[in-house]
Amino acid sequence: MLVTPARDEAAGIVETMESVIGQSLHPVRWVIVDDGSIDDTSALVNCRISGLDWITLLRRDSAAQPGDFVSKVHAVRAGVRALEGIGYDFIGTLDADISLELDYFKRLFRAFEQCPSLGIAGGHVIEAYDGRLVPQRVSANSVAGGVQMFRRQAFEDVGGLRPMRLGGEDSVAEILARMRGWQVATLFELQVRHRGRALSGSARPTRAWFARGLVNRSLGYAPLFQLSVSAYRAAVQPPYLVSGLAMLAGYAWAALRREARALDPDTVAFLRAEQRRRLLRAVTRQPEPVRCAG
């Protein structure tokens, strides 16, 4: 099962649809949720799904603005509700600006088959902009929110996606899944194309990185880990230096204001224990744990 939240995606949603429709193994059902578009998104989707009874368009009235993370989660939830009563083993989200290789789902589900403890997985996002293809930098035990596929039991274990005012709902799902014993993995051998830039492609990238710092503080990132992440981003992520400093500033600002955590103390403790292990591996140059192969 697949759910795609879409708002004002007329410029590229047909390309996304073609990449799913042409799959060698396509989802049993795909719900595209128009989250209050004011462009031709719905008209284009309606035109393309004619005769394809496994794809449903769901219109949702919404006064959401671009970047409204809560509205996006509610759109996904509306799509999930539309699938009630239908048997399925996997459920995933796919952003409306993503294109997939034609054997993507076949290879993705093969990975789930080979690893019973794999709870969330997805391909490696490649950003296409300015005539370039730029791989997103992502941890091996994390998956970009726009391509997260859940084993059904893992999805139910974490309670689905949680509305987060600042964003980070995909990170919360991953943390809770790992806490419950599920593996989470980006499959680097599976590439997916994102049209344009993601976080770094904001019209105001400094503000976007500041916001990411706010999110990290709300999730309970340990100060030392956040400092190391900020230093890394400053070195490798355009705009260089500014990206890391802006992220650190967002984290510090939220800390000084004593902003409430989005996660409970036990979950924060689990996350920080993970982060300590990651820092230790980085210092001792140990490789990331490899996901199971069978």
Task: Name each region found by the language model.
Residues S99-V134:
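Conserved donor NDP-sugar-binding/catalytic core segment of glycosyltransferases
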Residues A208-G294:
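Non-catalytic, C-terminal membrane-associated alpha-helical segments of glycosyltransferases
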